[in-house]
């Protein structure tokens, strides 16, 4: 935990997919109703319409027991997250173990990029309210101190439950994986909806937090930005996000729109299905990138079962894995216009959840109908993999 108490700035705009953030660092939030202030979310100021509490630095010192090392529950490139306690009615510090449990993210004092993302987090999460966005309770801006205060998410990040091995982190059961995927999809669909129109830009397992009942919520809005939606796109001169998750068109040209988030969500679905990280340099070279490794298995319903996390054993029906893979395949279309909207993804995953444990009339293991990806040679620089358009029904 020593790195929490030393100066550290983000070394690169892009960070790799392997995160050590126990709390999905840059925790996160929700707020206000389904309306968003029309004011421009500037990089230089906190919007006056942001209805969250402004804490003093001393209040948060008291709430976290003076930011003691044993209060640390997560750390990352921008700082550390501490566990604390507030009185539920007054939001004033209270003794440990009583009142409202909170998570306090303390920004490292160096780095303008970190400050900008801190402001972005407040100005988005202070305006948005949805069951699948982590709640932002307040912030502190005092002298050189910048902190964010969130609701405490008891089960930590999805990353821990998918990838960590050991007695404490049991493999996430299949039905919970489906529930988490649906919750995350609902949160992302809300961000893309009218009048919100927000591009999240950093969907990944470490940014999905789980409460005591394993309800999933999106966190870390430091890279979020307004629209555009539909077929319109921004051209960004600074590509930001996480290797392994970012859409190919965004990586190659900086073109960014809501369908870029959809691609990243497809990568997340593959992680949920396989129990493997989007990018892992500890795997053999041909298996480092999850999408590239999974592509040959996603050509048919029979082969797709070979990529399912073997720790799940007999918890799932074959057609359930096929349906999740089918959603992932279509999200991962190389052509952005061929990807589904997040509303379509929500409907597909809702259907999957509603039918868990109900065998279908056909046997998908014997059915070798193509799921979508086509094999064959393409330009290596493009790494193309094509698929059928997202139709009325996924499978």
From Swiss-Prot:
Changing residue 204 to R: Compromised flg22-induced ubiquitination and reduced phosphorylation. GO terms for biological process: defense response to bacterium; defense response to fungus; innate immune response; pattern recognition receptor signaling pathway; protein autophosphorylation; protein phosphorylation; regulation of defense response to bacterium; regulation of jasmonic acid biosynthetic process. The modification O-UMP-threonine is found at residue 237. Changing residue 202 to A: Abolishes kinase activity. Induction: By infection with necrotrophic pathogens and by paraquat. Not induced by salicylic acid, jasmonate or 1-aminocyclopropane-1-carboxylate (ACC). Induced by flagellin (flg22). A lipid is attached at residue 2 (N-myristoyl glycine). It is a lipid-anchor. SUPFAM superfamilies: Protein kinase-like (PK-like) (SSF56112). Gene3D superfamilies: Phosphorylase Kinase, domain 1, Transferase(Phosphotransferase) domain 1. It comes from the Eukaryota. Residues 354-365 have a biased composition (Polar residues). The modification Phosphotyrosine is found at residues 150, 168, 214, 243, 250. The active site is at residue 202. Pfam families: PK_Tyr_Ser-Thr. Plays a central role in immune responses. Required to activate the resistance responses to necrotrophic pathogens, including the regulation of defense hormone expression (e.g. jasmonic acid (JA) and salicylic acid (SA)). Phosphorylates FLS2 and BAK1. (Microbial infection) Xanthomonas campestris effector AvrAC/XopAC-mediated uridylylation prevents activation by phosphorylation at the same residues, thus affecting immune responses and reducing defense responses toward X.campestris, mediating avrAC/XopAC virulence functions. Belongs to the protein kinase superfamily. Ser/Thr protein kinase family. This is Serine/threonine-protein kinase BIK1. It comes from Arabidopsis thaliana (Mouse-ear cress). The lineage of its organism: Eukaryota, Viridiplantae, Streptophyta, Embryophyta, Tracheophyta.
């Amino acid at each position: 935990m020593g790195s929490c108490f030393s100066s550290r700035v983000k070394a690169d705009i892009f960070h790799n997919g392997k995160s050590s953030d126990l709390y999905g660092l840059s925790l996160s939030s929700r707020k206000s109703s389904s309306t968003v202030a029309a004011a421009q979310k500037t990089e230089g100021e906190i919007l006056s319409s942001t209805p969250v509490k402004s804490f003093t630095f001393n209040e948060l010192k008291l709430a976290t027991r003076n930011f003691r090392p044993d209060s640390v529950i997560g750390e990352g490139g921008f700082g550390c997250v501490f566990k604390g306690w507030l009185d539920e009615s007054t939001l004033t510090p209270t003794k440990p173990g009583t009142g409202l449990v909170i998570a306090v993210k303390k920004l490292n004092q160096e780095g303008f990029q970190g400050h900008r993302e801190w402001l972005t987090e407040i100005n988005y999460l202070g305006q948005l309210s949805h069951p699948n966005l982590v709640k932002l309770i307040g912030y502190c801006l005092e002298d050189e101190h910048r902190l964010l205060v969130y609701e405490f998410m008891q089960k930590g990040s999805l990353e821990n439950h998918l990838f960590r091995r050991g007695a404490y982190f049991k493999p996430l059961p299949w039905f919970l994986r489906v529930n988490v995927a649906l919750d995350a999809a609902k949160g992302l669909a809300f961000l893309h909806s009218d009048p919100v129109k927000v591009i999240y830009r950093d969907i990944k397992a470490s940014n999905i937090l789980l409460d005591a009942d394993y309800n999933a919520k999106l966190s870390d809005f430091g890279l979020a930005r307004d629209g555009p939606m539909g077929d319109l796109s921004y051209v960004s001169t600074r590509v930001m996000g996480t290797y392994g998750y970012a859409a190919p068109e965004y990586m190659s040209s900086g073109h960014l729109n809501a369908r870029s988030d959809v691609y990243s969500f497809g990568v997340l679905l593959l992680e949920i299905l396989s129990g493997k990280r989007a990018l892992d340099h500890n795997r053999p070279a041909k298996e480092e990138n999850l999408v590239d490794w999974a592509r040959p298995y996603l050509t048919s319903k029979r082969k797709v079962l070979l990529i399912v996390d073997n720790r799940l054993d007999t918890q799932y029906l074959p057609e359930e894995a096929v349906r999740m893979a089918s959603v992932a395949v279509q999200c991962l279309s190389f052509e952005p216009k061929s990807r589904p909207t997040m509303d379509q993804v929500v409907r597909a995953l809702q259907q999957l959840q509603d039918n868990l444990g109900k065998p279908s009339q056909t046997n998908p293991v014997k059915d070798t109908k193509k799921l979508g990806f086509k094999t064959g040679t393409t330009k290596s620089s493009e790494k193309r993999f094509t698929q059928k358009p997202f139709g009325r029904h996924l499978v």
